[in-house]
UniProtKB/Swiss-Prot annotation:
Record-linked Pfam families: CBS
Cystine residue pairs: none
CBS domain sequence ranges: 9-66, 84-141
Domain of life: Eukaryota
Stated name of the protein: CBS domain-containing protein DDB_G0289609
Keyword annotations from UniProtKB, A to Z: CBS domain, Repeat
InterPro entries referenced in this protein's UniProt entry, alphabetically: CBS_dom (IPR000644), CBS_dom_sf (IPR046342), Diverse_CBS-Domain (IPR051257)
CDD domains attached to this UniProt entry: CBS_pair_AcuB_like
């Protein structure tokens, strides 16, 4: 069974701009119940990725105040571009899913931005997507009566 990334990826994509402040990124992650946001320029080109972990590390700094509102205020002072991972690991939409799994395992990332043949961002594939596929493949099929 050969499954391609394009068959598994999420096409409803949330992205964030380079100039967005960290507080807005945090709110976007929380509001959409997601763990990573591709960072794009004004033309929609992928420039980086920011994760909930990146933001947790930024907000858990001993240099920030204890009060959450004060922490958010400090995050308003910094742009996504200041902490994003540049040149994130990506995969093409026509790649086999097994390649995505290997790439995630080797690079220790929880999700990959998916690019088309022209290098445009068109989706995301995550560990959860891979686990859902694994469950579907391994789950016994009930006998037909």
């Amino acid at each position: 069974m050969k499954v391609l990334v394009k068959q598994l990826m999420s096409k409803s994509l949330f992205t964030i701009n380079l100039d967005t402040t960290l507080d807005v990124a945090l709110k976007s992650l929380n509001a959409n119940s997601i763990h990573r946001l591709p960072v794009v320029d004004n033309d929609g080109n992928l420039k980086g990725i920011i994760t909930d972990r990146d933001l947790r590390l930024a907000t858990d700094s001993p240099f920030l105040p204890e009060n959450n509102e004060d922490r958010l205020e400090k995050l308003r002072l910094h742009k996504v571009s200041s902490i994003m991972k540049q040149n994130p690991v990506t995969i093409e939409d026509f790649s086999p899913v097994v390649e995505a799994a290997k790439l995630m395992r080797v690079t220790n990332v929880g999700g990959l931005p998916v690019l088309d043949k022209k290098g445009r961002l068109i989706g995301m594939v995550t560990r959860s997507d891979l686990l859902d596929l694994l469950i579907k493949v391994l789950e016994p099929v009930p006998p037909q009566s």
